[in-house]
C-alpha cells in the first residue's frame, strides 16, 4: 500500500523517469492516503487535486498549490464548500483542463463510480476504512451491511461523469455544484 504521492521527472521522450522525484501528502493508511492526482497550472502555480483511498466509494477531494511541480504543496481548506456529503459530489476528479478561448475557465472532470449509492455520506464509511487499516484503531464501529454491499458491487460500467467549472478566490480553487452550466456564461 502506498502512503504518499510521488512526482517524478520524465525523460525528454516521456518513456522513462530520470530518477529525480519528490514526495507529498504522507498519510499512514486509508482513507487518508491520496490517489487519483489531477495536475494543472494556472498563473504560474501548480495545482494537484487528489482523492482519498476508499475504493469506488467517493471521499473528500483535496486541492494543493505550489510554485513548482515538485512543491512544496500547501493543502488548502475544503475545495467543495457546498458538498454536505463530503464526497466531492459523489465523484472522483480524474482530470482538469483549461478551456481554450476563455479567460480563466478550468473544468474539473470526475468519475461518479457508484451512482446507485449517492445517498451515502462519507462519515458513514470513513471510520470503517480506518478500522481496517489503522493498526492503533480503538473505536467500536460495526460493519455496515449496506456499505459492504457497495464495496463488493464494483459495476463501474454504470459510472456517470461530472464536469464542473473551477472557481478561484485568489489562488484557492473551489468546485461548486451546478445543476447545469454553459461555457458561454464564462468570459
Sequence positions of predicted segments:
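Carbohydrate-active catalytic/glycan-binding domains of CAZyme proteins
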Residues: 1-187
